[in-house]
């Protein structure tokens, strides 16, 4: 299976669909940027080519 938008992920290949990426925003916390956690988000069209090369299941 694959992960829908908004689900927690570790890698682009886990996210459903060709155009969705695993996005890891950074948050300003305690005087430094900290990873806020990754979730599937809609990427741009160029993501598709990247995922087709990288991910066997796309």
From Swiss-Prot:
Main location: secreted
Cellular component terms (Gene Ontology): extracellular region
Subcellular compartments: Secreted
GO molecular function (one): ion channel regulator activity
Expression tissues: Expressed by the venom gland.
Keywords annotated in UniProt: Disulfide bond, Ion channel impairing toxin, Knottin, Neurotoxin, Secreted, Toxin
Disulfide-linked positions: 2-16, 9-22, 15-40, 24-38, 48-55
Domain notes: The presence of a 'disulfide through disulfide knot' structurally defines this protein as a knottin.
Known role: No toxic effects on mice at dose levels of 5 ug per mouse. May be toxic to insects.
Family statement: Belongs to the neurotoxin 09 (Tx3-6) family.
Protein name (Swiss-Prot/TrEMBL): U8-ctenitoxin-Pr1a
């Amino acid at each position: 299976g694959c992960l829908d938008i908004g689900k927690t992920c570790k890698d682009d290949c886990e996210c459903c669909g060709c155009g969705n990426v695993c996005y890891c925003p950074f948050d300003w916390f305690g005087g430094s940027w900290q990873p806020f956690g990754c979730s599937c988000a809609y990427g741009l069209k160029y993501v598709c080519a990247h995922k087709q090369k990288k991910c066997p299941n796309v």
